[in-house]
Amino acid sequence: MEQIFEKLMYASRWIMAPIYLGLSLVLIGLGIKFFQEIFHILPIIFEITEVDLVLVTLSLIDITLVGGLIVMVMFSGYENFVSQLDVGEDSEKLSWLGKLDSGSLKNKVAASIVAISSIHLLKIFMDVKNIDNDKIMWYLLIHITFVLSAFAMGYLDKMTRAGK
């Protein structure tokens, strides 16, 4: 009975495979939104202000960072929790593939979240005159929380690795 239970539990990791595949659909959605933003801005590129162009650029960078985060979670999560990716010797292999353990992945995700939060904060500062001070304070507190959390996770990971 125990052996059957353990085999079933081990096989249940494959439930995550379609979830990781589903993230690729989110990636397609981000790609569509990215190019929608570009096609929206191109016809009016000579009419918009520099500040508006910077805001659009920050939005595009934000989408790109989220896309990179999705790719990292998809591949690393699949490799760490489901099965090793067998992309073949003749195709390009990402240099970090197979090297990110769950601790490294958490640190990279935390760093990405801080970067994404920084971009949102920069967009808010570019429009500071139209945003209430209370909202700005909350945005700053949330960002500082992300930064401190990322720092703490990195420090704990470093301490854990030093103890091995």
From Swiss-Prot:
Family: Belongs to the UPF0114 family.
Protein name as catalogued: UPF0114 protein Shew185_3725
Record-linked Pfam families: UPF0114
Ranges annotated as spanning the membrane: 15-35, 53-73, 108-128, 136-156
Record keywords, A-Z: Cell membrane, Membrane, Transmembrane, Transmembrane helix
Signal peptide start-end: none
Lineage: Bacteria, Pseudomonadati, Pseudomonadota, Gammaproteobacteria, Alteromonadales
Compartmental location: Cell membrane
Coiled-coil residue windows: none
One Gene Ontology cellular component: plasma membrane
Membrane-topology annotation of the record: Multi-pass membrane protein
HAMAP family on file: UPF0114
